[in-house]
C-alpha cells in the first residue's frame, strides 16, 4: 500500500449535495449541473439555446443562476469562471452581458478557444461560487 502519494483524508462531516437541472446531457453522460462541497458550488460547463452567441450566453447564465439558487448561492458569489468558445471572435459580443451578470462582483476568468459538444453551440460557461 506504500507508493509515492500520501493518503487522502476526507473530513467525516463533509457533505456533498448534487443538483440536477434535467438537461439532456446529464443523463446521457452521467453528471449533474452542480455539486456543493467543501464550501463551494461547482457548476458544470453549461450551454444555452439560441441562434446567436448573445442568446446562448444569456440562456447559459440563466441556467447557471438557477443552479446556484438551488445551491443557496448566486452569481454575486462566483469566484471563478471559464468560458469555452469555438471561435474567440464570438467572445467580445458577450462582454456586456457578462459585465451585467456579474456587476460589481467580477470573478477571476479564463477564455479558452475549443470545440464544444455540438457545433450549434457558440459558448459554454463553467463557474465556481462560494456556497451559502
Label each PLM-derived region with a short phrase.
Residues 4-13:
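Short, Lys/Arg-enriched N-terminal segments with co-localized hydrophobic residues
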Amino acid at each position: 500500500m506504500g507508493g509515492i502519494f500520501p493518503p487522502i483524508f476526507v473530513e467525516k462531516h463533509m457533505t456533498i449535495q448534487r443538483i440536477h437541472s434535467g438537461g439532456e446531457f446529464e443523463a446521457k453522460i452521467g453528471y449533474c449541473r452542480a455539486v456543493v462541497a467543501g464550501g463551494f458550488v461547482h457548476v458544470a460547463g453549461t450551454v444555452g439555446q439560441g441562434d446567436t452567441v448573445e442568446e446562448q450566453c444569456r440562456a447559459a447564465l440563466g441556467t447557471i443562476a438557477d443552479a446556484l439558487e438551488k445551491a443557496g448561492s448566486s452569481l454575486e458569489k462566483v469566484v471563478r469562471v471559464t468560458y469555452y468558445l469555438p471561435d474567440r471572435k464570438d467572445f467580445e459580443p458577450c462582454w456586456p452581458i457578462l459585465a451585467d451578470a456579474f456587476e460589481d462582483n467580477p470573478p477571476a476568468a479564463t477564455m479558452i478557444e475549443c470545440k464544444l459538444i455540438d457545433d450549434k453551440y457558440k459558448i459554454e460557461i463553467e463557474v465556481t461560487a462560494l456556497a451559502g
